[in-house]
């Protein structure tokens, strides 16, 4: 069987043993790709590729709706969300739906509505995907030139980029509108242990918003992950939405500059590699956000961060021993350092013991007990509220540890049911997916650059050594 190569496409060609297999009317002879190469068979069939993308969107939205309803069906209002293995309901609660003071879930109906809306949307997308994959025109260029494209048409590609940017900007503004006008969102820092509130004075200062980007990603700086109030988060979304929309309009109205035309590879596989790189960055950032940030991901719904659980343990035992008569300000531990309290390198009063490494943690249940120089001894003696004790005791036993199958989880319950925090799930999954997307970016970028240079012609099977070897039998 001859090795296929199309100069028009500069794409590698796969030659299989079952090269005669025809799937959906497209075989290896006509497309240059075997059935398992998936959407590569549709590179030049814009109508069919549209069907594949719409159907894929339908699958994503179907998962969201079905999983949403599954979590609603299993939800127990009396238990914290993070104890129930939920990953979708915490996001809805963070947006302020169904939540009361202290992060208590008072109404699950909005969650049910969310699931149903996603299921209905997925049906529409699924129908559209099947229609375009099986019935609609194979190519859009002739019948619907606005939706048609050629991969090498740089102007059309940047127009499509612009449309995508406008849609992303609109998405960012949806959060801004929800926070400002439509009921507000959940603020873990609201006095008394968190509540839903409208954001009235969002941060628009470019110095503050873009200052996050100039911070070091390490240590106490923490880059954008260090954001610790909703005003900055919503202000950031306002800036992001504005930049995406104006950038989208710019890309629709302009043509790429000469240096851009020279610098980039202009092919379908190149665009795939750029997209994978962007998604990889998103995945790594999301991983850091959900692991470290207890403002964007409130601990009431996602469980405490690692440092938070550690500090909660120190606080819980300080409360207990103080009640039993211990002098928490002066008691020494086995190393001669303070058992309950000590000083940080810069002089603040911090919790003693192993949790000293997390001395710069900020958490809503702990901040009211600080003074101008770290933890305030008089507040620790007189001002500790019952809700702070309850919350820290709960967080102490729900540290985000353990493997994802919970074999190495923390045995926090009397019946030895191991606990795995949603923070562990979400951080690990986004890190792993971010890594795989990065590898996919390298793979497709390499292939796209090779194809553009003209030397990616597939494997020449005529001289493959195995063809000249004696059969095994």
Swiss-Prot record:
Its membrane topology is listed as:
Multi-pass membrane protein
Q: Which residues form the propeptide?
A: 1-14
Entry binding sites for [CaMn4O5] cluster: 367
Report the residues modified as N-acetylthreonine.
15
What biological-process terms (Gene Ontology) are attached?
Answer: photosynthetic electron transport in photosystem II
Chief place of localization: plastid
Entries under Pfam families matching the protein: PSII (PF00421)
Q: How does it assemble?
A: PSII is composed of 1 copy each of membrane proteins PsbA, PsbB, PsbC, PsbD, PsbE, PsbF, PsbH, PsbI, PsbJ, PsbK, PsbL, PsbM, PsbT, PsbX, PsbY, PsbZ, Psb30/Ycf12, at least 3 peripheral proteins of the oxygen-evolving complex and a large number of cofactors. It forms dimeric complexes.
- Quote the NCBIfam families the UniProt record gives: psbC
Q: Which named protein is this?
A: Photosystem II CP43 reaction center protein
* Gene that this polypeptide is encoded by: psbC
């Amino acid at each position: 069987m001859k090795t296929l190569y199309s100069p028009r496409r500069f794409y590698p060609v796969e030659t299989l043993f079952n090269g005669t297999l025809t799937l959906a009317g497209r075989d290896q002879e006509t497309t240059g790709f075997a059935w398992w190469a998936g959407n590569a068979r549709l590179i030049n069939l814009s109508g069919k590729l549209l069907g594949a993308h719409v159907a894929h969107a339908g699958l994503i939205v179907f998962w969201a709706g079905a999983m949403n309803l599954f979590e609603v069906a299993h939800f127990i209002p009396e238990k914290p969300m993070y104890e129930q293995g939920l990953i979708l309901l915490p996001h809805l609660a963070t947006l302020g739906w169904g939540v009361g003071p202290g992060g208590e879930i008072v109404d699950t109906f909005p969650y049910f509505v969310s699931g149903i809306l996603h299921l209905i949307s997925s049906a529409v997308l699924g129908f559209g995907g099947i229609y375009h994959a099986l019935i609609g025109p194979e190519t859009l260029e002739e019948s619907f030139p606005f939706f048609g494209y050629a991969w090498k048409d740089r102007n059309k590609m940047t127009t499509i980029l612009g449309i995508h940017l406008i849609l992303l900007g609109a998405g960012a503004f949806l959060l801004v509108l929800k926070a400002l006008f439509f009921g507000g969102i959940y603020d873990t820092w609201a006095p008394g242990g968190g509540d839903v509130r409208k954001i009235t004075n969002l941060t628009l200062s470019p110095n503050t918003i873009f200052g996050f980007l100039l911070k070091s990603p390490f240590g106490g700086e923490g880059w954008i992950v260090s954001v610790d109030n909703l005003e900055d988060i919503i202000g950031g979304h306002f800036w992001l939405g504005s930049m995406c929309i104006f950038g989208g309009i710019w890309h629709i109205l302009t043509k790429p500059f000469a240096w851009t035309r020279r610098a980039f590879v202009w092919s379908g596989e190149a665009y795939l590699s750029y997209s994978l790189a962007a998604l990889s960055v998103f995945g790594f950032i999301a991983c850091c956000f959900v692991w470290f940030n207890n403002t964007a991901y409130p601990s009431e719904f996602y469980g405490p961060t690692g440092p938070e659980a550690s500090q909660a343990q120190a606080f819980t035992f300080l409360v207990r021993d103080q009640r039993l008569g211990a002098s928490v300000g002066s008691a020494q531990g086995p190393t001669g350092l303070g058992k309950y309290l000590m000083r940080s390198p810069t002089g603040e009063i911090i919790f003693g013991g192993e949790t000293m490494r997390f001395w710069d943690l900020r958490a809503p249940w702990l901040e009211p007990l600080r003074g101008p120089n770290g933890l305030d001894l008089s507040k620790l003696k007189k001002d500790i509220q019952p809700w702070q004790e309850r919350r820290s005791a709960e967080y102490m036993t729900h540290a985000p540890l353990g493997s994802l199958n919970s074999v190495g989880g923390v045995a926090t319950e009397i019946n030895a049911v191991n606990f795995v925090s949603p923070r562990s799930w979400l951080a690990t999954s986004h890190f792993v997916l971010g890594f795989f997307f990065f590898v996919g970016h390298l793979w497709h970028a390499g292939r796209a650059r090779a194809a553009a240079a003209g030397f990616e012609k597939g494997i020449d099977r005529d001289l493959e050594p195995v063809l000249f070897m004696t059969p095994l039998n």
